């Protein structure tokens, strides 16, 4: 497939993990297993938070939508990735690439905002318990979830507007396993200035700012926890927040390193491994850290099993 600098291209080649040779087979089965666990685990959380009245609180409302976004986020990437791992020359049509890019940005930014909303919910519950019902009214938590989805739509649309109008000729090899904005921009044959400005705007507004808000929320939570008189009280509060904090660090940490590395070092194997962590591994962790460390969720699971499996 030779490059023709005068011809508009109709598809991209996703280089992906082609340099891993025989390890691609192991990677295929590993990613497939992780994807199945992600779908089952997050679907279980959605089911539990809908079916059990004890989980009809703002915290689990956020968790349900977070699980839905995790399912959609991974599904945007993994099925195509699995098909490409079994292909000798993985290609993706231009329209499919832009569609993947749009939904990748949409669900990724929605996840960032939902994590921020969940941090605010924990802040309100732990630091302002007497005012929690006022701070986290039904209008507030539904509005925060709606705003998270809206932010994702704005992000995806912003990326799309800047990229869909660019011409692509000649080079068509994307050094990645998905269509992300920066690798695609590098292939455009026109100025990408506004595309990079748009990406910077989205990164600052929907990634850096949410991360700073989460850090501020947990700083306040930490101060409150240290002020609790009994060690049992501290342990309970730490247990409540540790699972959320784990997901936040894993997601924002790897994503930040991947996007903030120097351009000369980007789009190599290290960048792809980092992306693999926050797009594939993190969504799998969500149901485990929230269910195995949360007595209310495990209790709801037991009640659901008793009602439908062990009941009369």
UniProtKB/Swiss-Prot annotation:
Residue numbers on the Extracellular membrane side: 1-26, 79-89, 165-205, 258-271
GO biological process, one term: sensory perception of smell
Gene3D superfamilies on file: Rhodopsin 7-helix transmembrane proteins
Residue intervals annotated with topology Cytoplasmic: 48-57, 111-143, 227-236, 293-312
Tree of life domain: Eukaryota
Membrane-spanning residues: 27-47, 58-78, 90-110, 144-164, 206-226, 237-257, 272-292
A single GO cellular-component term on record: membrane
SUPFAM superfamilies from the UniProt entry: Family A G protein-coupled receptor-like
Keyword Metal-binding recorded: no
Function: Odorant receptor.
Protein name: Olfactory receptor 10P22
Species per Swiss-Prot/TrEMBL record: Mus musculus (Mouse)
Taxonomic lineage of the native organism: Eukaryota, Metazoa, Chordata, Craniata, Vertebrata
């Amino acid at each position: 497939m030779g490059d023709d600098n005068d011809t508009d291209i109709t598809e991209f080649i996703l280089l992906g993990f082609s340099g891993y040779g025989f390890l691609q087979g192991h990677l295929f089965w590993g990613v497939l297993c992780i994807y199945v666990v992600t779908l089952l685990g997050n679907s279980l959380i959605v089911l539990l938070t809908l079916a059990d009245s004890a989980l009809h609180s703002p915290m689990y409302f956020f968790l349900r939508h977070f699980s839905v976004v995790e399912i959609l986020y991974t599904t945007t990437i993994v099925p195509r990735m699995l098909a490409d791992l079994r292909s000798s020359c993985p290609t993706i049509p231009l329209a499919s690439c832009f569609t993947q890019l749009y939904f990748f940005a949409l669900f990724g930014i929605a996840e960032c905002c939902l994590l921020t909303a969940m941090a605010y919910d924990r802040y309100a519950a732990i630091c302002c318990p007497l005012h929690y019902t006022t701070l986290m009214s039904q209008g507030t938590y539904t509005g925060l979830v709606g705003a998270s989805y809206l932010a994702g739509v704005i992000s995806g649309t912003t990326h799309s507007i800047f990229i869909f109008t660019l011409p692509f000729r000649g080079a068509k090899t994307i050094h990645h396993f998905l269509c992300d904005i920066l690798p695609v921009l590098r292939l455009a044959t026109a100025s990408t200035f506004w595309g990079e400005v748009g990406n910077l705007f989205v990164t600052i507004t929907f990634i850096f700012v949410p991360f700073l808000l989460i850090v501020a929320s947990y700083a306040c939570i930490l101060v409150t926890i240290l002020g609790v008189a009994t060690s049992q009280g501290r342990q309970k509060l730490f247990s409540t927040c540790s699972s959320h904090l784990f997901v936040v660090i894993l997601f924002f940490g790897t994503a930040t390193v991947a996007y903030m590395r120097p351009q000369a070092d980007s789009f190599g194997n290290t960048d792809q491994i980092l992306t693999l962590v926050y797009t594939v591994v993190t969504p799998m962790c969500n149901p485990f850290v929230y269910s195995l460390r949360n007595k209310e969720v495990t209790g709801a699971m037991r009640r659901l099993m008793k009602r439908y499996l062990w009941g009369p």
